[in-house]
């Protein structure tokens, strides 16, 4: 093989790696993670391992009801879909929306629509809906001034992304920052010590952990479900 062909082969490999990397951008208050994915699923019972080269990004999705020693679908907040199969969770009043993914589309919607229509999809989960079609949804007064590091699954400029606040903020401020960043859809993702652990893969295939200290939190072992982006 000539030097020119070797260089071309290396360049092609690098382009493929770049195409599968999680892209990161930032604003003053937010960090945006854009996974380049081929599919999405809801992992249940056990978080995908960092040794799995097919996983691009993985983080907690729906709320978990109780701190149980073993996994049960009834401990996941509201009905959910994994691998194209529907499962029944516990009814959670705080959940107002749902996210669904099917190979030819994704959609953010109100929970009542999701539960009544049962749309055909490969994966789905319910959570607290923050923004729908460019408009902020009604905010629970009791949550307005809750302070934490927030994370949401969002749609911006026609792309899916995971968005985090850079520091502890109120929910009201977090949503304000999302709106100012022209996020068109956003649904909350479970956070808090233990629940906020996540990881993603870069262009070299190397794993980067988010909140790695949470693996030492007491609640870490009780997590139940993860929105997972696959290469």
Residue ranges and their predicted role:
Residues 95-96, 147-152, 223-224:
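Short glycine-rich loop/turn motifs
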Residues 68-138:
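Active-site-adjacent helix-turn-beta-strand microarchitecture at beta-sheet edges
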Residues 129-157:
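Conserved beta-alpha junction segments in alpha/beta enzyme cores
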Residues 12-19:
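Hydrophobic h-region of N-terminal signal peptides that target proteins for export
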Residues 71-85, 155, 160-168, 172-181, ...:
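Conserved, well-ordered active-site substructure
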Residues 1-7:
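Bacterial N-terminal signal peptides that target proteins for export
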Residues 19-91, 163-164:
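Zymogen propeptides
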Residues 63-64, 192-194:
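Catalytic metal-binding/acid-base residues of hydrolase active sites
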């Amino acid at each position: 093989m000539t030097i020119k062909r070797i260089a071309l082969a290396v360049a092609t490999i690098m382009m493929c790696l770049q195409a599968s990397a999680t892209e990161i951008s930032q604003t003053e208050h937010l960090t945006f993670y854009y996974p380049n994915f081929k599919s999405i699923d809801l992992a249940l019972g056990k978080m995908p391992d960092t040794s799995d080269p097919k996983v691009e990004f993985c983080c907690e999705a729906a709320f978990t009801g109780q701190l149980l020693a073993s996994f049960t679908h009834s401990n996941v907040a509201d009905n959910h879909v994994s691998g194209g199969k529907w499962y029944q969770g516990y009814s959670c009043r705080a959940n107002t929306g749902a996210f669904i993914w099917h190979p030819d589309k994704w959609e953010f919607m109100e929970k009542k629509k999701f539960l009544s229509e049962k749309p055909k999809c490969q994966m789905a989960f319910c959570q607290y809906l923050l923004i729908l079609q460019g408009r902020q949804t009604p905010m629970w007064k009791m949550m307005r001034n809750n302070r934490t590091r927030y994370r949401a699954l969002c749609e911006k400029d026609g792309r899916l992304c995971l968005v985090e606040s850079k520091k502890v903020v109120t929910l009201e401020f977090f949503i304000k920052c999302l709106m100012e960043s022209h996020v068109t859809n956003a649904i909350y993702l479970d956070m808090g010590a233990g629940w906020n652990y996540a990881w993603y893969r870069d262009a070299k295939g190397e794993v980067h952990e988010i909140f790695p200290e949470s693996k030492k939190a007491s609640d870490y072992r009780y997590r139940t479900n993860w929105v997972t982006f696959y290469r």
